[in-house]
């Protein structure tokens, strides 16, 4: 794996872990009501998507279990549809998709060490 890919994976991991720390002990309703919180999570998801977009095709082909297209697609929807963001989808992504992504990215990084 190239160094650039490893850097991007660390960006994904850092942003994912930060999302988890931000939403820990929060309910979906608290998330929706806290503008600073949901704007922060949206921004971190954008970072994850941008980093995912920069991962080489070689790595994407090697790790097909990671939904690279969905990750990048989420980033695109968040960036270009700012006023139409569905916070229920953001919450679902943060609570259901990010935890397994963290484990997969950790495993990828570990396999490079």
Q: Where would I find each of the regions flagged by the language model?
A:
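Solvent-exposed interaction patches of small proteins and small membrane subunits
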Residues: 1-113
């Amino acid at each position: 794996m190239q160094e650039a890919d490893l850097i991007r994976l660390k960006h994904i991991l850092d942003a994912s872990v930060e999302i988890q720390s931000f939403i820990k002990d929060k309910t979906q309703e608290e998330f929706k009501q806290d503008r600073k919180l949901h704007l922060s999570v949206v921004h971190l998801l954008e970072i994850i998507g941008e980093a995912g977009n920069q991962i080489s095709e070689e790595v994407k082909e090697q790790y097909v279990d990671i939904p690279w297209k969905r990750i990048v697609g989420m980033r695109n929807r968040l960036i270009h549809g700012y006023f139409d963001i569905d916070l229920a989808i953001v919450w679902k992504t943060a609570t259901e998709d990010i935890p397994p992504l963290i484990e997969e990215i950790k495993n990828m990084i570990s396999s490079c060490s």
